[in-house]
């Protein structure tokens, strides 16, 4: 059996389709649902998987750069984080292209495509969403409002998927 290798052209198409799919889902969720607040039901709840609408102003799990570096103000921290994301995407992109050119496993290539597409989607969110949408807090966002909820480079990243791998009960 001959296995076809993922080359640059197929990798580019795969990443493009992933980013397009990611953005279409985010647009649909933002324009049809308010933010999922703590203790509110999920949009979709299959037990092991939940679809939530959460916006993240910082990094993973809501951490902000100025939580780690308290001498930074909110403005500088958010701008630095967005610029870091852009620089990181170039690094990930270089790694992806060099891997696609080599005779590496398709699993590695697909994994890097997924990471790159996710990082690119986060950049689109943080750079443009503040201008493209109104606030989603307590309401459904509007597309292309007169004034967005944040300036260019200061939008929130949309996080939606939650896979439950560990469950526990918080002590009261």
Identify the role of each PLM range:
Residues 1-172:
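Alpha-helical transmembrane bundles and membrane-interface segments of multipass inner-membrane proteins
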């Amino acid at each position: 059996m001959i296995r076809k290798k993922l080359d640059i052209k197929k990798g580019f198409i795969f990443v493009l389709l992933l980013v397009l799919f990611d953005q279409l889902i985010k647009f649909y969720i933002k324009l049809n649902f308010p933010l999922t607040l703590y203790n509110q039901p999920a949009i979709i709840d299959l037990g092991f998987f939940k679809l939530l609408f959460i916006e993240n102003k910082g990094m993973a799990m809501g951490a902000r750069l100025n939580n780690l570096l308290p001498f930074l103000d909110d403005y500088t921290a958010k701008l630095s984080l967005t610029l870091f994301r852009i620089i990181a995407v170039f690094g990930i992109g270089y790694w992806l292209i060099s891997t696609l050119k080599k005779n590496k496993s398709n699993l590695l290539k697909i994994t890097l495509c997924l990471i790159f597409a996710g990082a690119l989607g986060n950049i689109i969110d943080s750079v443009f969403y503040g201008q493209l949408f109104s606030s989603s807090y307590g309401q459904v966002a509007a597309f292309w409002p007169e004034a967005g909820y944040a300036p260019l480079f200061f939008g929130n990243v949309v996080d939606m998927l939650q896979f439950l791998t560990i469950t526990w009960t918080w002590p009261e």
